[in-house]
From Swiss-Prot:
This is DNA-directed RNA polymerase subunit beta'. Zn(2+) 1 binds at residues 70, 72, 85, 88. It comes from Mycoplasma genitalium (strain ATCC 33530 / DSM 19775 / NCTC 10195 / G37) (Mycoplasmoides genitalium). The RNAP catalytic core consists of 2 alpha, 1 beta, 1 beta' and 1 omega subunit. When a sigma factor is associated with the core the holoenzyme is formed, which can initiate transcription. GO terms for biological process: DNA-templated transcription.
Length: 1292
């Protein structure tokens, strides 16, 4: 007989998932998921290789192995779909259901879920709910000790000393005490409760009484407990059954009230107190269970779900061998042990100790299945490898989240070495013909077999079949190329260079077919990719869908990425050959061929140069009317060179004539123009030579071009500058020769003098006048000074007139290659070399000796001695390892930053906030040097209140208005020292940020668009330059000065991870507002007294610390009294969250700007928003929250508004600061947090909470395979198509 049913599989794509809920599955739920019970441990039949019925791969449970074919072969083909075979019981359907259908194993004895019973380092959920320690729960579950389930009828503590839920230690140190208690109870029973002394029970009681006295005598504990139970009703239990009974008895409401009362009696203010912490943890877990309406008994399993077989496959290898997923081994063990326990229990004659042992083995086998790695002794394979359980499949870099869901291998991709493509346009890339034929193969085949043209007319196809088309492609038939060109014309490709540190690491290009096997890359985009042509490889990806193609063109095309993200400066600046060519082109020289000629048109000047009547560098005149589209301060004859006329000719309209490096953005200055009636030739003779355009000038010019030109014209102009550079660097005939190096001979005198000084230091040390540390510091300083003198002299030498046209000097001067340090090493001296040093170790010396004190005196030109070469190799290797370390650490930090901020997306125009941050110039207080100007901090942001000139009372910027470059300059020209601006920190959008709080998008120079993923951009902008930061930690002599603190990467890590600074680098800060009354020296320390309006505070400071205040100075809470790093958590306690945020912004900017890296404040603020937006409840008021709970500031504000409007008591909470690790883990999305770190803990907490993930961030949507709610995810398909076609129309 056959039966039919509707196929349970829903073929609809899960595109409209709005949210995902995670909760603890009850036993009923597991049975509901299941398609049948797995009763056998077998997998497949070794002869037929078919799944065994009732086994782990049973087709009746999990579905057919072959599409629409039952196991016995009675029903085949799609026409029987939905039919169940009456012989083998298999539903006839698609085999893909074997990836979806689940089974179950019905357990004979309940077991605890290991996630709920073992959660180190924090207590497990079971121990928190039952209020017994984690260790005791473990002892009960693994049949080591019994737990009291019922204290019975006797309520007198003297007779019945056992407490409810007390774990009876019968194996450890407390066993003697437990035995004594049991003796007391048994003694009472046989003396007082048994009337007949001759009865069997009296005799038994006496035996138990004696046995408990002498631990060497064997007796059955179970019998003893049954004896006590018979007369008193006292009951104990062991294993998961006992825990289940206790969980069934729990009253969550009663428990919640009890914990709240306990919290009120405890020290409520001190959340750090151990007792309070324990109560808060319990309260949190009980609250989660109460609010989720889940019963704690679900933490104990009666059935184990069996995951679909195709997720744990058996794979056939060569030579009739098989390999299987580790999970199958775990399931087999569970089934075998479960069956054995069933037989034992059915027998009924087996001693309880053996039964308990079998139950323990079953518990352990289920533990191993769920989480093998967290067990004391994980299950191992034959080769002693720890087997991968279900938890291991989820967590880590190779786990499901990071390996399969967030990062997948991509089809339609290729990779090859890159070479320069100077002939390409900015949006083009040269792809080898072989690669094109592979990547675009399906599209080319479609074109070859297509029977209709683009107008719908029937045509004769080039190939008759797909096979023929494939052969034509394989043989590279001449007929295919027309189709190939048509295909690539419609399809851009994405180029990616690893490591992708920021979004410019992936850009789109229009492909062009090139010969060879290397990808040809446009030279201007190399900076964005951080690529060079020394063997770098790049990957190519093909966007397949129409929307993907449109998105690639509309958003990712390389010609759209002119500005860098972190600072808004052009990232497509010409380099090397291009710089050199433009430098040569714009060079001026007196006495050149054709000097003094006056031209009336640009064409005339070009013709004269091409017919060799005038030299490129000759100073000539040209009428300003020759440039009708360029602005001049006045009309007349412009004094310039033919090279500059050619250079300006490619810059396009609306750009003023560029005649020197100090150009004006409005018009060419009057000083270069000879007015009518004045002697032009005389002016040419008097003309001062203007330096040629170096790399800095060209970079500044690109800034100007970005402001003046329309966006669509800019890439073309940049291409023109590139083409000029390559052309004229060829014409310049610049060569490099060892004989170009200038001769420098003066260094020996410095060396002789320094050698004598080193000898003196050694003598002083031998006499005990200097310590070894002092001698070392002086020697290193001496040789550094010598190198500086040599370097200065070389710098002066190469500036001499005789080296004006020297090829190497020209390269350095133009910025094309090399700098003064290279020259010093090339023909001066190499100087001191660094050596490896463990900065973390505690060494006896108080200074870091990471420099070899013997310098390399020879230059590369002279050649190094063997000793010098050997010494220099230390530094070279240290450089390589440091770079590798920095790259890894920086990459990890970027990942953490992205995880903490990815949910921040621009999703509104104006949140209407009235709060902002006060910004002022960041100045190094000790040296008074400027780190970040007020202009840099306010430009491209929105004001909150009107900004008024204090002198004239004139409003410069209206309230809620953009501070443009022009307005920022006006503000800085007044006496205004601080400005209140809008900030992402105080944006009132709950999920995301509004446009006005963020301000201008630095990559476009316009108001940030809706859908911009500013969180990820901020993380990339801060993480990407991380590799450029120094790794060195300076601490000299234990003295804490500004220079001796953790710097560079280590300091950044200290701030982002909110690490308490070490004692020697920690700054003492004032707790009060007041005046420094006195600074005195007391025994072994200094005392600073600060007088406030209320009292006086005395701060005792060791001599090793450097005091930065003086008597009479005004201080406020949080002001530094000594130099050093402030403990952020201490600052929060003393001065509040606002001060903490300001301090963190300033300190992060210091780290980057000292290294010469500019990052916009707004990116730093985004990170700080995520680190400081949680509060801890101190008084729950009339809300459902509990004391100690962490809540988001936006949620709290809304909750308090509703409470106050209802006339109820609001919630009181204090701000908290978390490091980026914790910030990422405390995300509202459990999918995002679980894919970051602590996967097991986050999923356990989410399941207990019955948590709903509303998929608001980027990662959650990538995980479920949906569109991210950012970028073009905000656009309709029609808008995207329009943007894509508009970009094609703008291509030049």
């Amino acid at each position: 007989m056959t039966t039919t049913r509707r196929n349970k599989r829903n073929n609809k794509l899960y595109k409209n998932i709005k949210a995902i809920k995670l909760s603890i599955a009850s036993n009923d739920t597991i049975l509901n998921w299941s398609e049948g019970e797995v009763t056998k441990a077998e997998t497949i039949n070794y002869k037929s290789l078919k799944p065994e019925p009732g086994g782990l791969f049973d087709e009746a449970i999990f579905g057919p192995v072959k599409d629409y074919e039952c196991a016995c072969g009675k029903f085949k083909k799609i026409k029987y779909r939905g039919v169940r075979c009456d012989r083998c019981g298999v539903w006839v359907t698609e085999s893909i259901v074997r990836r979806e259908r689940m089974g179950h194993i019905a357990l004979v004895s309940p077991v605890a879920h290991i996630w709920m019973s073992k959660e180190l380092p924090s207590p497990s959920k079971i121990s928190l709910v039952l209020n017994i320690s984690y260790k005791e729960v473990e002892q009960v579950l693994y049949f080591v000790n019994y737990i009291v389930l019922d204290t019975g009828k006797i309520k007198d503590d003297k007779i019945m000393p056992f407490k409810f839920k007390e774990v009876l230690d019968l194996t450890g140190k407390g066993s003697l005490s437990t035995r004594q208690k049991m003796r007391r109870v048994i003694g009472y029973i046989f003396r007082n409760l048994i009337k007949s002394k001759s009865s069997e029970d009296y005799r038994k009681g006496k035996i138990f009484y004696e046995s408990l006295k002498n631990s060497s005598l064997p007796f059955s504990l179970n019998d003893a407990f049954n004896y006590i139970k018979k007369y008193t009703g006292f009951r104990v239990g062991i294993g998961a059954e006992a825990i289940l009974e206790l969980l069934n008895k729990i009253d969550l409401n009663l428990e919640f009230s009890r914990l709240n009362d306990a919290l009120r009696k405890a020290k409520k203010d001190s959340v750090e107190d151990a007792k309070v912490k324990k109560i808060l943890r319990q309260l949190e877990t009980i609250s989660w269970f109460r609010n989720s309406k889940l019963h704690p008994k679900n933490m104990i399993l009666h059935t184990v779900p069996v995951i679909p077989p195709d997720i744990r496959p058996i794979i056939q290898l060569d030579g009739a061998k098989f390999t299987t997923s580790d999970i199958n081994n775990f399931y087999r063990r569970v089934i075998i042990r479960n069956d054995r326990l069933r037989r034992i229990l059915e027998d009924g004659t087996v001693p309880s100790i053996v039964v308990n042992n079998e139950k323990r083995l079953l518990q352990e086998s289920v533990d191993a299945l769920f989480d093998n790695s967290s067990r004391h002794k994980p299950s191992l394979s034959k080769d002693k490898r720890s087997l991968k359980s279900l938890t291991d499949r989820l967590k880590g870099k190779q786990g499901l989240f990071r390996h399969n869901l967030l990062g997948k291998r991509v089809d339609y991709s290729g990779r090859s070495v890159i070479v320069v493509g100077p002939e390409l346009k900015m949006y083009e890339v040269g792809i080898p013909a072989l690669m094109i034929l592979k990547l675009f193969k399906p599209f080319i085949i479609h074109g070859l077999i297509n029977k209709f043209d683009e107008n719908g007319n029937e045509i004769r196809p080039i190939a008759a079949s797909i096979r023929q088309a494939e052969d034509m492609i394989k043989n590279q038939d001449d007929l295919i190329w027309g189709i190939v060109y048509d295909v690539i014309k419609d399809r851009p490709v994405l180029l990616n260079r690893a490591p992708t540190l920021h979004r410019l690491g992936i850009q789109a290009f229009e492909p062009r077919i090139v010969d060879g096997k290397a990808i040809r890359l446009h030279p201007l985009v190399t900076t964005a990719f951080n690529a060079d042509f020394d063997g770098d490889q790049m990957a190519v990806h093909v966007p397949l869908s129409e929307n993907a193609v449109n998105e690639a063109r509309a958003v990712l095309l390389a010609s759209k990425h002119i500005l860098g993200l972190k600072d808004g400066r052009p990232i497509v600046t010409p380099t090397q050959d291009m710089v050199l060519g433009n430098y040569y082109l714009t060079t001026e020289r007196k006495g050149q061929l054709g000097e003094g000629i006056i031209f009336s048109t640009v064409y005339e000047a070009r013709a004269a140069y091409e017919s060799q009547k005038v030299h490129l560098h000759a100073i000539v005149g040209i009428s300003t009317k020759a440039f009708p589209n360029k602005k001049f301060a006045c009309q007349g004859t412009l004094i310039t060179t033919v090279g500059k006329i050619i250079f300006n000719d490619v810059l396009g309209n609306n750009v003023p004539y560029i005649n020197d490096g100090e150009f004006d953005e409005n018009a060419c200055p009057e000083k270069f123009i000879v007015k009518q009636g004045e002697d032009v030739r005389q002016s040419i003779l008097k003309h001062q030579i203007i330096p040629a355009f170096s790399k800095k000038v060209i970079s500044k010019l690109i800034d100007l071009l970005y402001l003046l030109l329309e966006f669509k014209d800019l890439p073309k102009t940049l291409d023109n500058i590139k083409a000029l550079g390559f052309k004229y660097s060829t014409f310049s005939s610049t060569t490099v020769s060892v004989f170009d190096i200038p001769k420098y001979t003066n260094k020996q005198n410095y060396f002789d003098s320094a050698d004598q000084q080193v000898l003196k230091y050694k003598q002083f040390y031998n006499k005990g006048l200097l310590t070894d540390d002092e001698r070392y510091k002086r020697v290193v300083k001496l040789w550094n000074n010598v190198k500086e003198k040599v370097s200065d002299e070389i710098q002066n030498l190469i500036k001499q007139e005789q080296y004006r046209d020297n090829s190497i000097v020209v390269m350095a001067d133009s910025g094309a290659r090399c700098n003064i340090s290279n020259f010093t090493q090339l023909f001066g001296m190499r100087g001191l070399m660094s050596k490896s040093f463990n900065y973390e170790r505690n060494n006896q010396s108080k200074i870091i000796k990471d420099t070899i004190e013997v310098p390399i005196k020879h230059s590369f030109f002279e050649g190094l001695t063997i000793n010098e070469y050997f010494n220099s190799s230390y530094g070279a290797r240290k450089g390589m390892t440091d770079t590798a370390m920095k790259t890894a650490k920086s990459g990890y930090m970027t990942r953490k930053l992205v995880d903490a901020t990815h949910e921040l997306i621009i999703n509104h125009d104006d949140c209407g906030t009235r709060k902002g941050i006060v910004v002022e110039a960041i100045v190094e207080t000790k040296t008074k040097s400027l780190i970040e100007s007020l202009f840099d901090r306010i430009v491209n942001r929105y004001s909150i209140t009107p900004i008024v000139d204090p002198e004239t009372q004139k409003t410069i910027v209206e309230a809620n208005s953009l501070i443009t470059t022009q307005l920022a300059k006006q503000i800085c020209a007044t006496s205004i020292k601080e400005v209140l601006v809008r900030s992402v920190i105080y944006c009132e959008r709950e999920n995301g940020i509004c446009q006005y709080c963020f301000g201008i998008d630095l990559s476009t120079g316009k108001l940030v668009e809706l859908g911009t993923a500013v969180g990820v951009i901020a993380a990339q902008s801060i993480g990407e330059p991380g590799t450029q930061l120094t790794m060195r930690t300076f601490h000299t002599g234990g003295v804490s000065t500004e220079n001796n603190l953790a710097q560079g990467f280590e300091r950044l890590k200290q701030i982002f991870e909110v690490v308490t600074p070490k004692d020697f680098e920690k700054a003492v800060i004032s707790e009060v507002k007041g005046t420094v009354k006195s600074i005195t020296t007391v025994q072994n320390a200094q005392e600073v007294v600060i007088k406030s309006n209320v009292d006086e505070r005395i701060y005792t400071i060791p001599f090793s610390a450097q005091i930065r205040v003086h008597v009479g100075d005004q201080v406020s809470p949080g002001s530094k009294i000594t130099e050093g790093s402030v403990d952020i958590k201490q600052l929060l306690r003393i001065a509040g969250i606002q001060r903490v945020r300001q301090y963190m912004i300033v300190e992060i900017q210091k780290v980057y700007r000292i290294q010469g890296i500019d990052i916009a404040d707004k990116y730093v603020e985004i990170i700080i928003r995520q680190l400081t937006n949680l509060l801890q409840v101190t008084d729950a008021g009339n809300s459902n929250l509990f004391v100690g709970q962490l809540v988001h500031s936006h949620y709290l504000n809304e909750l308090n508004k509703s409470l106050l409007l209802a006339g109820k008591m609001p919630v009181i909470a204090i701000n908290q600061v978390f490091g980026i690790d914790e910030a990422a883990s405390k995300s509202n999305s459990f999918l995002s947090a679980a894919s970051f770190q602590d996967t097991k803990k986050i999923l356990t907490d989410a399941a207990v909470k019955n948590q709903v993930d509303y998929l608001l961030g980027l990662k959650e949507n990538v995980i479920i395979g949906g569109k991210i709610p950012a970028g073009t995810g905000f656009l309709t398909d029609e808008e995207l198509t329009f943007l894509g076609s508009k970009t094609v129309a703008e291509e030049y």
